Structure formats: C-alpha cells, structure tokens
Regions:
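N-terminal glycine-rich phosphate/pyrophosphate-binding loop and immediately adjacent elements
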Residues: 2-139
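A glycine-rich dinucleotide-binding beta-alpha-beta segment and adjacent secondary-structure elements
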Residues: 188-201, 357-363, 420-484
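Helical element adjacent to the flavin cofactor pocket in flavoenzyme catalytic cores
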Residues: 214-264, 270
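C-terminal segments that line or cap access tunnels to active or ligand-binding sites in enzymes
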Residues: 325-435
Length: 511
C-alpha cells in the first residue's frame, strides 16, 4: 500500500490550492480526481468551433501584478503564471426597483471613488452611506487577512482593538445594516445586485461576507483568465506537479479508512488503497459522511449540522455560440444582471420553482477578451440560480423538454430586457441544469455553491469555529462547502488555509 503524508480528494479550486500548499510545505502529497481533467466547475468544454467557459463569470481578489489581491498572491506563490483580462466595469443591472415602479439601469465602475461618485449621480444623497460602506469593507478585509495569518486562531483582545465593527456587525444581515446606515432605498436596491453571486437574499445574507466581496471587486476589479477556467486549474495542477506532487486522474476515492481510535488511516480508491493520516476533501461534507464513512465514525454533531444547513444555489446555464460578433449584436457589456425585481427576498422565493424563476445573469466573454471565440462570433452565457430542489420533481422522461423550455424562456427574457436579438444567430447551444452539476461535480441537488451563507451559518462563525468544524482527526473539507463559502477565491483560500492548518498539526505531531 503506497504511503503519503497527505491525500487530497478532488481537484477543484479548493483541492488544487490545498494540494499545492501541502507540496510547497515539503509533504509527499497525492491528489485524486475522478475525472480526466482538473477543475470541477472550473473548466471548459467544446461544441463545434466554440470553447465554452463552464462556470466562471469573473474572479475577485486577483488584481494587477503591481497591486495584487490575496488570491493572486497565493496562486503566484505556487508558481502560477498565466495571462488575465480585467473587466472594465463591476456590473450593469437592469431591473425594476423594489417599489415595483422605478426602472433601474445602472452601470457601476471599478475603484471606490468612481463607484461612490456614480452612485451619488444615480441616487442623490447616498454618498455618505456608500462611502461608509466601503470604509467598513476596508476594516473587514483587514480582519480577514489577520484571521488567515493566524490560521483562525485570533486574539479576542486584538480583534476588539483593531476590528470593532467586524465583531459588532458580523452577525447582522445586509438589509438590516443598510437600513441602520440610512441608505436610501433605491441605493439599497442597486447595492444588492451581487446577492446572486452568494445565493442568499439580502434579508438573510451575511453583511460581512457581502461587503467583503463587494469591496474586493471594486478595489481589485473583476478578472478572467485568457483561456477559460481550464487554464487556471490546469495551471495549478502543473504547479503541484512541479513541486513534486503526485496526481491520480480517472480515479475515484470510494471510502475513507479509519483506525481503532476513529482517526484517518487511509483512502480506498478504484486504483487501490492508499495509506495516510491526513485527508483534505474537496467535496460536500454530507456526501462524504453519507457515502464514504462508516456510521460509527460520524460524530452526532456533524449529522445535526448537516441537517440544519441549507443547500445553496443550484445552477442552470445556457451556453450560446453566436455567429455574429458582440458589436454586431449590440452587446456592449460584459456582465448584466437581469432580475425581475430588485426585491431580493421576492427573487429568492421565485427562484424556488421552474415555473416562477425568471432571474438571470448574462455574460459575454468577447467584450473583455475579443479572441475568446473565432473572429466574427461571440460567446454568451445566461445563468439562472434555483433556490430549492424543484428539478427533483421533473420526470426523467420530461427532462429534455423541461430544460429546453426553460432555456428558451431565459433567451427570450434576455432579448426583451437587454434589447437585442440573438436567436437567429445561434450556431451552438448547450444547456447545464442542476442535474448536470450532480452528474459531473458530484454535489447534492446540483448545489455547486455548497451551503447557504446566511444567519448563523455564515463565513464568520465558520472561521471562528474552525477547530470544531472538523472533529474527525486527520480529515478536513475544502472548497465551496467549506469555511469560506462559494466563489473561486473563497474556494482557493479555504484550500490554502486548511492545508496550512494541516501542516501546523503535522509539525506539532513531529515535535
């Protein structure tokens, strides 16, 4: 039986970061991936002459070489060096305000000053509340950096002295704090646009998590790799190999092995058994506990926690390869949010069923990267999120008809709301549903976002409870369902943070 210092199961963003950190720490590390390529959701696929980005709209916390964000620093520390494109604006949103009457069409730029100035132009009198929001974001980001630097073992007194608002506001929701800041309602509607990126309505979404994400996008901009997410994840895989890591592709981890004390002793795979005392799983915890562990080693607390949590957003994506350029079609924006209403609670409820869900985000990659597809063409994706498991109610015999009808609805709504025509120019079309995510990424209900970051179960308590979040000796979880929640940068940070924690535990064991 081959022996490794650590085994990483799953080569998604979190797993790749964890594997790279373990290898960089000098540990003999094995990375197991059931597919023939890395990435999980962070990948690409081809149809005809088009290569489609599977999932990424834009990555935050990247930044420039001169002013890098934390995510870029981490990946470049591993040796990643690939070309990137910066998205010129943060987003455009076209919708109806929560009052049900006012039309919103707003494009928000990068940099805090320009963002605040544009918000003041759109909603006179909101300047102070928006500026205060970014000031809080600066404090929150600094608090997050401090927590990462000490692997979650924060000093309460230091936190109280340096990050009082982080502690004071950490348990509150977005809308509650917006109201307390006396932010005008129309400004709240616009500022809530990014809620879909975290999959929780603003009445329940963690203010800390949301503002931190917004601050990162505005300060460091949004970025995409030159050749889709596949370039990012294959690049990280190459970094891992260059540091001496071993990779088993087309290999499925089927069972985690334990010793008499219920500590990890190895992994059973379709390629044979492996001996190790440390496993980092880039998988949903519920899947691991239910299918890869004997019941007697699963702590009762983790069963209760799994039942208490709510699965987050389930993706539905329409991929369009169009035989006209973005300019010819009149598509000028990279990202456009197209909800029916700025009332996030209403949109969240509507997103629970196929019949009522009309929310979507349009991305046109060629606006930022003209060479993304062949000359004279462009690639557009329309993404909708489901907030409940309504696709489980679809009869398999009706699946193709149901997904096709919903895709046609999204295309029609996009044309109406954005004011362009794309249907006659569709050369290639592919559809991904929550079932697709279940099949390819092995996530329950297709919930690629992991668990909802809301109320008691947001990033702050997860980070603070890191010590009890992983009670089984030798096993930790990384990725979207882990401590940081969803998002490429969050998944990468979770892998890096928990690998560092594992390295520290190894050092203590050796002492």
């Amino acid at each position: 039986m081959p022996k490794f210092d650590a085994v990483v199961i799953g080569a998604g963003n979190g797993g790749l970061a964890a594997a790279c950190r373990m290898a960089k720490g000098g540990k003999k590390t094995l990375l197991i991936e059931r597919h023939n390529m890395p990435g999980g959701c962070a990948s690409s696929f081809r149809r005809g002459r088009f290569e489609f980005e599977t999932a990424l709209h834009e990555i935050c916390e990247w930044g420039t070489k001169e002013n890098p964000g934390g995510c870029r620093k981490t990946c470049e520390e591993f040796g990643l060096d690939i070309p990137w494109h910066m998205v010129p604006d943060n987003f455009r949103v076209i919708t109806t305000a929560s009052d049900g009457k006012t039309h919103i069409d707003a494009t928000l730029p990068c940099t805090v000053k320009e963002f605040v100035d544009e918000m003041e132009r759109l909603v006179p009198g909101c300047r102070k509340s928006i500026q205060d929001l970014f000031d809080l974001g600066t404090e929150f980001h600094a608090a997050g950096d401090y927590s990462l630097s000490v692997a979650g073992k924060t000093d309460p007194k230091y936190m109280q002295e340096h990050f009082p608002n982080f502690l004071r506001l950490g348990s509150y929701t977005v809308n509650r704090v917006f109201r307390a800041m006396k932010m005008p309602k129309l400004a709240q509607d616009i500022m809530n646009t990014y809620w879909g990126y975290l999959g929780v309505d603003a009445d329940h979404l963690s203010f800390l998590q949301y503002v931190n994400m917004l601050w990162l996008y505005v300060n460091h901009g949004a970025w995409i790799p030159d050749k889709t997410s596949n370039e990012l994840t294959t690049g990280l895989l190459e970094c891992f190999r260059n540091m001496g890591g071993e990779v088993w592709m087309n290999c499925t981890a089927t069972e985690i092995l334990f010793d008499e004390s219920k500590a990890v002793r190895g992994v059973k795979t379709t390629c044979g058994d492996v001996e190790t005392k440390h496993i980092l799983c880039n998988m949903n915890q519920n899947m691991v506990y239910a299918t890869m562990c004997p019941p007697e080693v699963v702590p009762e607390r983790m069963v209760k926690l799994g039942n208490a949590r709510t699965y987050s957003a389930r993706m539905f994506v329409v991929y369009l390869g169009l035989d006209r350029s973005a300019e010819e079609l009149g598509i000028r924006d990279y990202t456009v949010f197209l909800p029916t209403s700025a009332n996030t609670a209403k949109e969240y409820e509507s997103g629970k069923t196929i019949a009522t869900n009309c929310n979507q985000v349009m991305v046109c990659y060629n606006v930022v990267n003209p060479g993304f597809s062949p000359e004279g063409t462009c690639v557009v994706s329309l993404t909708s999120t489901f907030m409940d498991d309504d696709w489980a109610n679809v009869d398999p015999d009706d699946y193709v008809e149901t997904k096709t009808a919903f895709a046609e609805k999204l295309i029609k709504l996009f044309e109406e709301r954005y004011g362009v025509t794309v249907t006659p120019y569709i050369e290639e079309l592919e559809i991904a549903t929550p079932w697709t995510m279940c099949n390819y990424v092995n996530v329950p209900q297709g919930a690629a976002y992991g668990f909802e970051l809301k109320d008691w179960d947001n990033m702050m308590p997860r980070m603070m409870m890191m010590g009890t979040e992983f009670p089984v000796k030798g096993r930790k979880f990384v990725g979207a369902a882990s401590i940081r929640g969803d998002g490429y940068n969050s998944a990468i940070f979770s892998g890096d943070t928990l690998a560092k924690k594992t390295l520290a535990e190894m050092k203590a064991e050796e002492a």
